[in-house]
């Protein structure tokens, strides 16, 4: 079970990724975690990445792909894996294909932009405890105040509407083209083409989870 999960920030990928990992017993692989682990372990690839990052450079796609191949050869990936935030661009997806890294499923969790803006910009947080509210879906008993302590709630900078819209713009420019890339692979009947599925990301966590499980079974 080798899965790539796509979707805009705020589409609910993190929640569903956790459920997939637990259900199928596969690890979630993020390039950030992978880089940090390789650097800490002092592997040859990790040392290369460390030198590049220390000089302020960007780690090349070739090195990322080499790290990916190294990571998925680990025993915990024997039953599969879930890529988190990778690939981000078409060149990375092409490199993954050329490196003969087989993917079974590419699943896009689709949520319209305005719904994502409403989801994220409506969040309010009690900083001391980490309790999260939403002005519409999970409002505090007293507007703007934590239910337990009565202390003021804050809106995190990442949740400001302008910031959310900027993140969505980056997603549409850099990552959304991957949807077309994988759809084209399927349409052309490529041998290595994964199964591509778009699911509706509006609904309860359980209903979206069921859609995912129906696809992955």
UniProtKB/Swiss-Prot annotation:
The ranges of region (LID) come to: 122-159
One of the GO biological process terms: AMP salvage
* PROSITE patterns xref list: ADENYLATE_KINASE (PS00113)
One family name in Pfam for this protein: ADK_lid
Give positions of region: NMP: 30-59
List the catalysed reactions. Answer: AMP + ATP = 2 ADP
User: Which GO terms of the molecular function aspect are on file?
Assistant: adenylate kinase activity; ATP binding
Positions binding AMP in this chain are 31, 36, 57-59, 85-88, 92, 156, 167
Q: Which Gene3D superfamilies match?
A: P-loop containing nucleotide triphosphate hydrolases
UniProt KW Iron keyword: no
Top EC group: transferase
Residues annotated as binding ATP are: 10-15, 123, 132-133, 203
Checking PANTHER family in the record gives:
NUCLEOTIDE KINASE
What family classification does the UniProt entry report for this protein? Belongs to the adenylate kinase family.
Any idea what job this protein has? Answer: Catalyzes the reversible transfer of the terminal phosphate group between ATP and AMP. Plays an important role in cellular energy homeostasis and in adenine nucleotide metabolism.
Q: What is known of its domains?
A: Consists of three domains, a large central CORE domain and two small peripheral domains, NMPbind and LID, which undergo movements during catalysis. The LID domain closes over the site of phosphoryl transfer upon ATP binding. Assembling and dissambling the active center during each catalytic cycle provides an effective means to prevent ATP hydrolysis.
Q: How does it assemble?
A: Monomer.
Instruction: State the protein's name.
Output: Adenylate kinase
Organism the protein comes from: Cellvibrio japonicus (strain Ueda107) (Pseudomonas fluorescens subsp. cellulosa)
The encoding gene = adk
């Amino acid at each position: 079970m080798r899965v790539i999960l796509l979707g805009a920030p705020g589409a609910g990928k993190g929640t569903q990724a956790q459920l997939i990992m637990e259900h199928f017993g596969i690890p979630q692989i993020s390039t950030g975690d992978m880089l940090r682990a390789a650097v800490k372990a002092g592997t040859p690839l990790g040392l290369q990445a460390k030198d590049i990052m220390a000089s302020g450079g960007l780690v090349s796609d070739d090195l990322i792909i080499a790290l990916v191949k190294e990571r998925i050869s680990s025993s915990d990936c024997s039953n599969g894996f879930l890529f988190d935030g990778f690939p981000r661009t078409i060149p990375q997806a092409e490199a993954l294909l050329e490196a003969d890294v087989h993917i079974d499923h590419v699943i896009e969790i689709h949520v319209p932009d305005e719904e994502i803006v409403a989801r994220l910009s409506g969040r309010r947080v009690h900083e001391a405890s980490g309790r999260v509210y939403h002005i519409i879906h999970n409002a505090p008993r007293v507007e703007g105040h934590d239910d337990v302590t009565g202390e003021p709630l804050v809106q995190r900078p990442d949740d400001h509407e302008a910031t959310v819209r900027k993140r969505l713009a980056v997603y549409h420019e850099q990552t959304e083209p991957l949807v077309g890339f994988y759809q084209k692979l399927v349409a052309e009947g490529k041998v290595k083409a994964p199964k591509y599925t778009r699911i509706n990301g509006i609904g309860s966590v359980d209903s979206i989870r069921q859609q995912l499980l129906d696809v992955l079974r």
